[in-house]
UniProtKB/Swiss-Prot annotation:
Spans annotated as 3'BD: 1-110
Effect of residue 65 to A: Hypersensitive to MMS
EC number: 5.6.2.4
Annotated function: Initiates the restart of stalled replication forks, which reloads the replicative helicase on sites other than the origin of replication. Recognizes and binds to abandoned replication forks and remodels them to uncover a helicase loading site. Promotes assembly of the primosome at these replication forks. Serves as the initiating protein for assembly of the replication restart primosome; binding of PriA to an arrested DNA replication fork with unreplicated lagging strand triggers assembly. Sequentially DnaD (possibly as a dimer) and DnaB homotetramers bind. Required for replication of plasmids that have a rolling circle mechanism, which produces circular single-stranded (ss)DNA intermediates corresponding to the lagging strand template, which are then converted into double-stranded (ds)DNA; priA is required to activate the conversion of ssDNA into dsDNA.
Gene: priA
Pfam families registered for this protein in UniProt: DEAD, Helicase_C, PriA_3primeBD, PriA_C, Zn_ribbon_PriA
Record-linked NCBIfam families: priA, PRK05580.1-3
Name listed for the protein in its UniProt record: Replication restart protein PriA
Gene Ontology molecular functions: 3'-5' DNA helicase activity; ATP binding; ATP hydrolysis activity; DNA binding; zinc ion binding
Length: 805
């Protein structure tokens, strides 16, 4: 093959297509679809993906540039993933390069560097020449200041300095230095004997190697530790020819120091067996089917997953298990590693870039056959997939909010169709869309209505916080919750307290004039964080110190409103001074391994109360937890989002599911200011069916999913009028060109009307069947492409929005 079609690493509308490159003779027969290459593009060299190799090019009459270099020896993307990338960019209206990069770990994304080189015979002033190394090269990033940059620029224009563009990977393979003897044991003994007393450390190394088996290789760090020596001693012995060194690649394994207790399959209950049987039959017949496994919390869904995977692996096939990021607890990893050992790769955001890269390479090299991971693990480069499982399928974190804005569930179904294998969606509170599909027979519904071993569902009490206020209780803890906490701790049992937000106090307010500090770049109030006494914007990252006086009226009466985890922790220590509390939130778990340490400490009984935000709502299973308290059930209910009632019911049901999962019965106390709302009322009886009927009636009335599909077009500009006018034109174009059944809402200012100094307007498109919608939206992007490329106007399109803010 003589030519390669390459998608280059440039995210603009004009360049969103394959370019032809000539394959040089020395790379012929080596370049394959799915490989990464370095190609010249304009004045620079950039990374690209090979989408096809072919005999001839339509441009063969013109001068076609050559592929510069090959970055891979085997394709990093399989043929199936290459096809999937086209579907993904089409479905999400994203650039082809963006879709391709979404499938790979960050380590494989290119790092670009400009290198400056002194031209032959150039005469440079000493202050410039001094900056260049012995090889007469200098990295652009190493230029010390603007004055030097100006000087260098002049010499580049004169031709004294050449500029070249380099492409590198972000992470390298981890290589470990190994040491072994370079002589026989007799020779080593003889040399050791001839050494003086001053060379005792050299003797120690030689004696150690004499005691080891012949030809053994030992990591240099281990050798130094065992013989109490340094690398300088090793270097001396290498120079003497007695030792030799070699470098071997090792994986960065986040679990290498952990022992996983081997587990055996558990006997299934009759209900579990009835749910497992249809999955087993589908696996045996190699057909594609989507199952919705609707099982109450603690009903044994994980055991069904494990036994299904066992079947898949026994057939020599591979499996993907997706778990929400916050459910990827050590407990969850233990379940899969305990059953399948070294066949498991784990991928989540807690791993370093290098660790993620190494887990991906285990999959790519076919060294593992099961991946357990968060959203992006759906792109694991398996070529013989036998099953995909999505646990907690209702979780909104399966939807990516940046381009490409894909939903992992849709990608899973697409991949499973290709591999002719089943998808299992599991949840105690499925999305209305999934449950409606199961009711229509698009998915097959499997139900688990009881907890395993006949354990009862926890008793749920609702506490009306308005009544508490009327009765003079101004505390964030109701009388009932305080009594239950004291009783639980007195019995030596544990409690989980859940708060539906993060941070210390939600906002700061002046009690005299009502002023609330807003982010200067976004239309959103700043969040107060007590550690460091800072106000932070969670949208753009802006930070500032807490004001001591009001910037508006100079009053000193500044008050902190809201109840964040830090504040709750302080209150707890006042009202229950002897209680041991572990707080889990973004601040306490930001350091690597902190999440695991805190959960292990709680599991070992080192605390009475686990206090936290969303991250403690799922996947935790502690036998001694008998009480769950929800401090603020209403937070998610009052967000301007058509899914707010659904999210509230899901969250409260999931949190309630943490109580009484073993022998001891559980109790849940939910504090609320809106106890009559059906999403809160129905949590009491764990009644998903009734909630589904209620919410479906509301969605039908309001023309929301699953009755209609949604698309969201958001326009932003630094000038409010430009954003509004552009959004108005887009809405007008859509209204004129969409079908009569399609509804266009807006344009209106987005709920958060300004982020990072850009004003935001949005249009919501509600449609049942709109075959031309994708083409119409592409036309809009095409029409505004110049303004978009110049960053004047930004238009984002979300074909299945989960965030309406």
């Amino acid at each position: 093959m003589n030519f390669a079609e390459v998608i280059v690493d440039v995210s603009t509308k004009n360049i969103d297509r394959p370019f032809d490159y000539k394959i040089p003779d020395h790379l012929k027969g080596m370049i394959k679809t799915g490989m990464r290459v370095i190609v010249p593009f304009g004045p620079r060299k950039i990374q690209g993906f090979v989408t096809a190799v072919k005999e001839a090019s339509d441009l063969s009459g013109k001068s076609v540039k050559e592929v510069e270099d090959l970055l891979d020896l085997t394709p990093v993307l399989t043929e199936e993933l290459m096809i999937l990338s086209s579907w993904l960019s089409d479905k999400t209206l994203s650039f082809k390069i963006t879709a391709l990069q979404a499938m790979l770990p960050a380590a494989l994304k290119a790092k670009y560097e400009k290198e400056l080189k002194i031209a032959h015979g150039a005469d440079l002033p000493p202050q410039v020449e001094r900056l260049f190394s012995e090889t007469k090269t200098l990295l652009y990033s190493d230029i010390p200041d603007h004055e030097t940059l100006k000087l260098i620029q002049r010499h580049v224009q004169k031709g004294d300095i050449d500029v070249t563009y380099k492409v590198a990977q972000k992470t390298n393979k981890k290589m470990v230095r190994h040491i072994q003897a370079n002589a026989s044991k007799e020779e080593l003994a003889k040399q050791a004997e001839g050494l003086s007393r001053q060379a005792a450390k050299q003797q120690a190394i030689l004696h150690f190697l004499i005691s080891e088996p012949e030809g053994v290789k030992i990591p240099a760090a281990e050798l130094c530790k065992k013989t109490d020596t340094s690398s300088a001693t090793i270097k001396t012995l290498i120079q003497k020819g007695l030792l030799k060194e070699s470098y071997e690649e090792v994986y960065r394994d986040p679990y290498q120091d952990k022992m996983f207790k081997k587990t055996e399959p558990l006997p299934l209950t009759d209900e579990q067996r009835a749910a497992f049987e249809p999955i087993r039959e589908t696996l045996d017949s190699d057909e594609h089917k989507v199952f919705l496994l609707h099982g109450v919390t603690g009903s044994g869904k994980t055991e069904i997953y494990l036994q299904s995977i066992e079947k898949v692996l026994a057939k020599g096939k591979e499996a993907i298990v997706l778990v929400p990021e916050i459910s990827l607890t050590p407990q969850m990893v233990n379940r899969f590693k305990g059953r399948f050992g070294s066949q498991v790769a784990v991928m989540h955001s807690g791993l370093s870039t290098g660790e993620k890269y190494d887990e991906w390479r285990k999959i790519h090299r076919k060294e593992v056959r099961l991946v357990v991971g968060a959203r992006s693990a759906i792109f694991a480069p398996f070529e013989n997939l036998g099953m995909i499982i999505i646990d907690e399928e209702h979780e909104s974190s399966y939807k990516q909010e940046e381009m490409p804005r894909y939903h992992a569930k849709e990608v899973a179904i697409k991949r499973a169709e290709h591999h002719s294998c089943p998808v299992v969606l599991g949840s105690a509170t499925p999305t209305l869309e999934s449950y409606a599909r199961a009711q229509k027979g698009v998915y097959e519904l499997l139900s688990l209505k009881h907890r395993v071993n006949h354990r009862v569902m926890p008793e749920v009490s609702l506490v009306d916080m308005r009544e508490e206020l009327r009765n003079g209780n101004r505390s964030m803890f109701s009388v009932e919750l305080m009594e239950k906490l004291e009783e639980t701790i007195a019995k030596g049992e544990q409690a989980v307290l859940f708060l539906n937000k993060r941070g210390y106090s939600s906002f700061v307010m002046c009690r005299d004039c009502g002023y609330v500090p807003q982010c200067p770049h976004c239309d959103i109030s700043m969040t107060y964080h007590r550690y460091g006494q800072r106000l932070k914007c969670h949208y753009c990252g802006h930070e500032e110190p807490v004001p001591h006086t009001c910037p508006e009226c100079a009053s000193e009466h500044i008050r902190f409103f809201g109840t964040g985890t830090q504040r709750v922790e302080e209150e707890l220590t006042k009202v229950l001074p002897s209680a041991r509390v572990i707080r889990m939130d973004v601040d306490t778990t930001s350091r690597k391994g902190a999440h695991e340490k805190l959960l292990s400490a709680f599991g070992e009984g080192k605390a009475d109360i686990l206090l936290g935000t969303q991250m403690i709502a799922k996947g935790l299973d502690f036998p001694n937890v008998t009480l769950v308290g929800v401090l603020s059930a209403d937070t998610t209910l009052h967000i301007p989002d058509f899914r707010s009632a659904e999210k509230t019911f899901q969250l409260l049901t999931q949190v309630s599911g943490r109580a009484g999962r073993h022998e001891k019965p559980g109790h849940v106390i939910i504090q609320t200011y809106t106890p009559s709302h059906y999403s809160i009322q129905l949590t009491k009886t764990h009644d998903y069916e009734t909630f589904y009927q209620h919410e479906m009636a509301h969605r039908r009335e309001q023309s929301y999913p699953p009755y209609y599909y949604l698309a969201l077009v958001t326009v932003s500009h630094e000038e409010v009028a430009k954003a509004a006018v552009t959004a108005e034109k887009i809405a007008h174009f859509l209204k004129a060109n969409c079908g009569a059944d399609t509804k266009i809402l807006g344009p209106s200012a987005s709920p958060i009307a300004r982020i990072k100094d850009r004003y935001r307007y949005q249009c919501v498109i509600k449609y049942k069947q709109e075959t031309q919608l994708s083409a119409l939206l592409k036309k809009i992007l095409e029409h505004y492409k110049r303004e978009i490329e110049q960053k004047h106007v930004m238009i984002s399109i979300d074909m299945n929005p989960y965030m309406m803010m």
